[in-house]
Amino acid sequence: MRKPISLKEIARLAHVSHPTVSRALKNNPLISQSTGDRIRRIAAEHGYQPNLNARSLVTQRSNFIGCVVTDIADPFIGEVISGVEQVAAQHEYSIILTNSGGDPDRETRAVRSLVERAIDGVLVIAAMAGGAPSPYFSEREIPIVLINNHHPGNFVHSINVANFDGAQRITHHLLDLGHRQIGYIGNRFGGQSDQDRYRGYRAALKKARVRYASELVIHAESSLEGGYRGMKQLLDLRTQPTAVVCYDDITALGAYKSIRTAGLQVSRDISVAGFDDLFFSSYLEPSLTTINQPMREMGEQAMKLLLDLVAPSRKNKKSTKTQIVIPGQLMVRESTSALSSRHSRRAFQGL
């Protein structure tokens, strides 16, 4: 097996100094195009591979970022990761991805494992343990950024859409359409993001002087099955809702199926609203009214924040908590309609 070529040997073959080779392989603009091309050609011909361990000893950075997600199959998470990876690639960072499977304990263990490795920072997307007093979500030397959640600790950073405001706006939209029996299907594993959306829902009802009915609130889970079962519970009530706010678009999609299984129609018989504006939401029949979350932008901004936190100028300096909140946009579509006499009769008669 051929021994890997060293920078020193490349320098000898290219008739340049060792520092020149190092700069050329990093595409330093101080190195001329012809010299850089010659050095890179020699390196490629001899199968040069950079010694990442040696580089990290010099730079005190590994150029690896840990990323913990609840479910890699979740379209929301996929969009966020695409934004993260775009910025990471621009700065020559690699991502170590781990899936918690929606288990808060497993998520915390994953963060612990990443923190104990020689990585530069950790991103936690749709954090399940974000509200828990875990020591790994407190004062860490390695920065942690939560996406779609936040933590009460002083040194855990976060980036979110305006969850409270978004839920309040979409509930106000339903109120403006005349609805008063408005249900909420939440995510019992949603952490702070679910709490904020639930508070927004309640705030809108209070502002409109509409009585809060606890039986209209279902704590399900963010999944098709969770939305289906949550909606079925609401439809089984003697006094049914005429409209429902869902934690996210996946939950709303499950609610669609439950409504149709009951022989009813979305919008005509019951209005449904989501949160996220996933790629399929505008293609549903009827198209889904929802809050647009700029998911890719959230990933980009989270990665930029993490890069700022790991920059040499910030090393060994305690940084106060950074909380970035991005406004969402109400997308009014076909799944919500004005309260009709048909709605009113069904709400008070049940199935």
Residue ranges and their predicted role:
Residues L13, H18-R23, L57-A73, H173, ...:
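Short beta-strand segments enriched in small/hydrophobic residues
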